Regions:
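Conserved loop->alpha-helix
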Residues: 1-202
Length: 202
């Protein structure tokens, strides 16, 4: 599990594909006590450590993950958001995340007002029913609060500290971002849908 509080930015060192599995090497900002088999969130995607060489950590990614997330768009030199898995007793500063991506969105607008940045993101149809103003969402592993929601487009208002610690400040219009829906929101929406269907209400 993760919390959506990014702990640093990693850099893609190498990418190679063999037999439908892509191996990626990432330079991590902190590898203290990191072990093979550990889970790490890379742009919100839960990946398993398969090799550690100093601060260069290797992960294997299957084709489905590459196709369903923005990891398939990565090239050498790109930056990614990093979060180590949650441990018992750790503070949950954002909200609980699984690292399982529901879909990808596209940035449709980016504006600045003083030190604050705002993004508008077009959500895929499959997750639009889970979007609520002031609700939880994860974008590339980051846990911001949803702003206004209008016809499948939702706004995020990003504080300076988040801009400094994550890759969001470097994002531009047209960029693809990974989206994970809050599990509690998903459960509530799908339970209500099921109950209404059982009662014959569409």
């Amino acid at each position: 599990m993760f919390t959506g509080i990014v702990q640093g930015i990693g850099q893609i060192i190498s990418l190679s594909e063999v037999n439908t599995v892509t191996t990626v090497e990432i330079k991590l900002p902190n590898v203290a006590n990191l072990a093979i088999g550990a889970s790490v969130s890379i742009n919100g995607v839960c990946l398993t450590v398969v090799r550690i060489d100093s601060d260069i950590v290797q992960f294997d990614i299957i084709n489905e993950t590459m196709e369903r997330t923005n990891l398939g768009d990565l090239t050498i030199g790109d930056s990614v958001n990093i979060e180590r898995s949650l441990k018992f007793g750790d503070e949950v500063g954002g909200h609980i995340l699984s690292g399982h991506i529901f879909g990808t969105g596209i940035i449709s607008a980016k504006t600045r007002s003083g030190d604050q940045m705002s993004l508008s993101i077009i959500a895929p149809p499959s997750i639009r029913k889970y979007l609520t103003e002031k609700g939880y969402i994860a974008i590339d592993g980051i846990s911001p609060t949803v702003g206004q929601v209008d016809n499948g487009v939702f706004d995020l208002h990003i504080i300076p500290e988040t801009m400094r610690l994550t890759t969001l400040d470097a994002k531009d219009i047209g960029d693809v971002v990974n989206i994970e829906v809050d599990s509690n929101t998903q459960l509530i929406v799908e339970t209500i849908e099921r109950l209404l269907k059982e009662r014959g209400v569409e």
